[in-house]
């Protein structure tokens, strides 16, 4: 599985050219993309500036010598490469298994070309088998948990050891065990309107390409070619 993730990440790095501002994703597959960008800077003299999606990726990029800038200092990003936990046939996805969904969506939004790198196990007919992360402010989080519970969403707080995980943005994550999300766009809008929810892990209609690594090789799926 790690070999497939590496293939996907390295393949995505081929889309990066000199002069680009690039979004550096978070997670086990995006890790290999960031590593390959670091290698190209060192060995090929690649000239890029990165914008990171988590403190983990920031540390990785700094260690590789990738020049970084703040999302606040730019207006657009040429290319962002990130992982995904699930991708359906309509190119909707669930992200946030690494607890970086808020920063990931902030970086994805001003991106001209948004690419996901996944192994073939992440392709699904319907989203929801992977728990849906919902980032919530700490104030009122327990009340919101009960709201989700009453709605039948089977919520659980994301934990780190015996304490609730706190994101880079100082929020909690409530994971929803939905089983199947029949209408991701509608459910995303519902969460958007829920007071106390900062962001959720439904990335609907955002991705342009999905690079899929499988036993038979690498496939590049284009969102604008989907039916």
Swiss-Prot record:
<feature type="binding site">
    <location>
        <begin position="26"/>
        <end position="29"/>
    </location>
    <ligand>
        <name>substrate</name>
    </ligand>
</feature>
<comment type="subunit">
    <text>Homodimer.</text>
</comment>
<dbReference type="InterPro" id="IPR004788">
    <property type="entry name" value="Ribose5P_isomerase_type_A"/>
</dbReference>
<dbReference type="InterPro" id="IPR020672">
    <property type="entry name" value="Ribose5P_isomerase_typA_subgr"/>
</dbReference>
<feature type="binding site">
    <location>
        <begin position="82"/>
        <end position="85"/>
    </location>
    <ligand>
        <name>substrate</name>
    </ligand>
</feature>
<keyword id="KW-0413">Isomerase</keyword>
<dbReference type="InterPro" id="IPR050262">
    <property type="entry name" value="Ribose-5P_isomerase"/>
</dbReference>
<dbReference type="GO" id="GO:0004751">
    <property type="term" value="F:ribose-5-phosphate isomerase activity"/>
</dbReference>
<comment type="function">
    <text>Catalyzes the reversible conversion of ribose-5-phosphate to ribulose 5-phosphate.</text>
</comment>
<feature type="binding site">
    <location>
        <begin position="95"/>
        <end position="98"/>
    </location>
    <ligand>
        <name>substrate</name>
    </ligand>
</feature>
<protein>
    <recommendedName>
        <fullName>Ribose-5-phosphate isomerase A</fullName>
        <ecNumber>5.3.1.6</ecNumber>
    </recommendedName>
</protein>
<dbReference type="GO" id="GO:0009052">
    <property type="term" value="P:pentose-phosphate shunt, non-oxidative branch"/>
</dbReference>
<feature type="binding site">
    <location>
        <position position="122"/>
    </location>
    <ligand>
        <name>substrate</name>
    </ligand>
</feature>
<comment type="similarity">
    <text>Belongs to the ribose 5-phosphate isomerase family.</text>
</comment>
<dbReference type="Pfam" id="PF06026">
    <property type="entry name" value="Rib_5-P_isom_A"/>
</dbReference>
<dbReference type="InterPro" id="IPR037171">
    <property type="entry name" value="NagB/RpiA_transferase-like"/>
</dbReference>
<comment type="pathway">
    <text>Carbohydrate degradation; pentose phosphate pathway; D-ribose 5-phosphate from D-ribulose 5-phosphate (non-oxidative stage): step 1/1.</text>
</comment>
<feature type="active site" description="Proton acceptor">
    <location>
        <position position="104"/>
    </location>
</feature>
């Amino acid at each position: 599985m790690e070999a497939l993730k590496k293939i996907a990440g390295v393949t995505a790095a081929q889309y990066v050219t000199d002069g680009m501002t690039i979004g550096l994703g978070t997670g086990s597959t995006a890790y290999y993309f960031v590593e390959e960008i670091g290698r190209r800077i060192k060995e090929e003299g690649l000239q890029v500036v990165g914008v990171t999606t988590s403190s983990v990726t920031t540390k990785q990029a700094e260690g590789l010598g990738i020049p970084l800038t703040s999302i606040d200092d730019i207006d657009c990003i040429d290319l962002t490469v990130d992982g995904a936990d699930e991708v359906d046939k309509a190119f909707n996805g669930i992200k946030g298994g690494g607890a970086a969904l808020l920063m990931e969506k902030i970086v994805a939004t001003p991106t001209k070309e948004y690419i996901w790198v996944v192994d073939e196990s992440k392709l699904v007919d319907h989203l929801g088998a992977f728990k849906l992360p919902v980032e919530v402010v700490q104030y009122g989080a327990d009340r919101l948990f009960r709201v989700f519970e009453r709605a039948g969403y089977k919520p659980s707080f994301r934990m780190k050891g015996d304490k609730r995980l706190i994101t880079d943005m100082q929020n909690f994550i409530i994971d929803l065990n939905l089983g199947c999300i029949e209408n991701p766009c509608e459910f995303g809008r519902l969460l958007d309107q829920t007071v106390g929810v900062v962001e959720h892990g439904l990335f609907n209609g955002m991705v342009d390409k999905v690079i899929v690594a499988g036993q038979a090789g690498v496939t590049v799926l284009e969102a604008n070619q989907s039916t």
